[in-house]
Amino acid sequence: MFHPIEEALEALKKGEVIIVVDDEDRENEGDFVALAEHATPEVVNFMATHGRGLICTPLSEDIAGRLDLHPMVDHNTDSHETAFTVSIDHKLTKTGISAQERSFTIQALLDEESVPGDFQRPGHIFPLIAKKGGVLKRAGHTEAAVDLAKACGSQGADVICEIMNEDGTMARVPEISEIAKSHQLKMITIKDLIEYRYNITTLVNREVDITLPTDFGTFRVYGYTNEVDGKEHLAFVMGDVPFNSGPVLVRVHSECLTGDVFASHRCDCGPQLHAALRQIAEEGRGVLLYLRQEGRGIGLINKLKAYRLQEQGYDTVEANEALGFLPDLRNYGIGAQILRDLGVQHMKLLTNNPRKIAGLEGYGLSISDRVPLQMEASEHNKQYLQTKMKKLGHLLHF
C-alpha cells in the first residue's frame, strides 16, 4: 500500500504529486504534496479538484523569515500547533484565487529576489512554518513536506492540500489508497519518513567520555547530546570501542527517576538497570544505553499523573491513554545512532519488549539474540507487569 521514501522523492523531483499520510492517533489524514517549484496551475487545480481541502505552502523558517511572514496569531491554540502565517497573495495578482494566480504566488515565494513588500496580506495562499528538526520535532504534514523538499535538494518549500471525500468528510487511508491508485500517485507515511531521517541524518554528538567506577565494575561512560531536542543521553561501556566483531551484549534503558534513583516498587526499572549493568560486567563486554525517555516518553510529571490515575483503578496503559498519550511514546532512533557511533552493528539485546527489538532493527541494527531480563514481581508492581505482558506484548512469565 505504501511506497518507499526513495520512490516518493524521485516522484517529487519529476514534478509529480504524492500523498503523505499521518498516524491514526494524530489527524489520521492524507495530504497531496508537491514541490513548490513544480506547483504549476495544473498541480494547483488538481489539488483543488481532487483534494478539496485548504491549499497551503509549508516553508522553512529561513524562507518565512526572509519574507517577513509572521505567525497568524500570537498564541496558537490549535490542538496540533499548526503554524499558519498571515495568508498572502502576490501584489501582481488580481483576485488571487485562480489556479494560475495561486501558482504565481507560490512560485514567487521561492524567488530569492522576492521581498516582503511583494505580497499582499491577507490573501489566498496559506504559508505554514515548519519547525526546525522537521518530523523528528513535530510529526506533521508541514514538517514532512519541508523535509521531503530538502531531501530532494529543493529550497524547503512545498504546496500541500488535505484530501476530502466527495461528501465533505475527511478521507481516511482506505479512501486515500483508492485515490492514489486511480491517479497512480506514490503514497508514504510520516512514520516511514521519520525512520528515513533517523537513518540518513546524524543527530547525536559525542560530547565527553570518562571512566566511572561503580558497584558493578568500572565502565567507560560516553555522554551524547541530541540535536533535535537537546536531551542528554549516556552510554555505559565495557570493552574496546569501536566494537568491530561479534554480537555485543546491549541494554537500552529508558530513564525512570522514581525507580532508578528512589527505588520505587511501582515498577521493575531499578532492578532491571542494576541487573543489566551486572550482566554486562560479568560478560566483560557490552553497552548500556541510558536514554532520557522518562515514563515511556511522556515525562516525569505526566508519569506521576498516570500514577495518580492508577491509584483510582486504571492500569498503566489506560492511565496513559486517559492523559491523551499512546501507551508507549519511546523512539529508538537516537539510541540506534549512539550504538552505531560506538561501532555496534550486531547485538544480543537484554529486553523483554519485542517492540524494542523491532524498533532497533528498523534502524539497520542486527539482533542475533534476545536475553530475558525478568525481575521478581512484588505486591506493588505485579499488576503493572501483568498489564505490560497482556497489553504491550512483553515476554514475561508468572
Swiss-Prot record:
Gene Ontology MF terms in the entry: 3,4-dihydroxy-2-butanone-4-phosphate synthase activity; GTP binding; GTP cyclohydrolase II activity; magnesium ion binding; manganese ion binding; zinc ion binding
GO biological process, any: riboflavin biosynthetic process
GO cellular component, one term: cytosol
Reactions catalysed: D-ribulose 5-phosphate = (2S)-2-hydroxy-3-oxobutyl phosphate + formate + H(+); GTP + 4 H2O = 2,5-diamino-6-hydroxy-4-(5-phosphoribosylamino)-pyrimidine + formate + 2 phosphate + 3 H(+)
Amino-acid positions noted as binding GTP in the UniProt annotation, renumbered to this chain: 251-255, 272, 294-296, 316, 351, 356
Binding residue positions for Mg(2+) 2: 27, 141
Binding site for Zn(2+): 256, 267, 269
Residues binding D-ribulose 5-phosphate, per UniProt: 26-27, 31, 138-142, 162
Region of interest: DHBP synthase: 1-199
Domain of life: Bacteria
Keywords of this entry: GTP-binding, Hydrolase, Lyase, Magnesium, Manganese, Metal-binding, Multifunctional enzyme, Nucleotide-binding, Riboflavin biosynthesis, Zinc
Involved pathway(s): Cofactor biosynthesis; riboflavin biosynthesis; 2-hydroxy-3-oxobutyl phosphate from D-ribulose 5-phosphate: step 1/1; Cofactor biosynthesis; riboflavin biosynthesis; 5-amino-6-(D-ribitylamino)uracil from GTP: step 1/4
UniProt region (GTP cyclohydrolase II), positions on chain: 200-398
Record-annotated site: Essential for DHBP synthase activity: 124, 162
Pfam families xrefs: DHBP_synthase, GTP_cyclohydro2
Active site (record annotation): 328 (proton acceptor), 330 (nucleophile)
TM stretches of this protein: none
Amino acids binding Mg(2+) 1: 27
Details of cofactor binding: Binds 2 divalent metal cations per subunit. Magnesium or manganese.
Keyword Nucleotide-binding: yes
Record function comment: Catalyzes the conversion of D-ribulose 5-phosphate to formate and 3,4-dihydroxy-2-butanone 4-phosphate. Catalyzes the conversion of GTP to 2,5-diamino-6-ribosylamino-4(3H)-pyrimidinone 5'-phosphate (DARP), formate and pyrophosphate.
NCBIfam families: PRK00393.1 (NF001591), PRK09311.1 (NF006803), ribA (TIGR00505), ribB (TIGR00506)
Family designation: In the N-terminal section; belongs to the DHBP synthase family. In the C-terminal section; belongs to the GTP cyclohydrolase II family.
Name of the featured protein: Riboflavin biosynthesis protein RibBA
Organism lineage: Bacteria, Bacillati, Bacillota, Bacilli, Bacillales
Gene name tied to this protein: ribBA
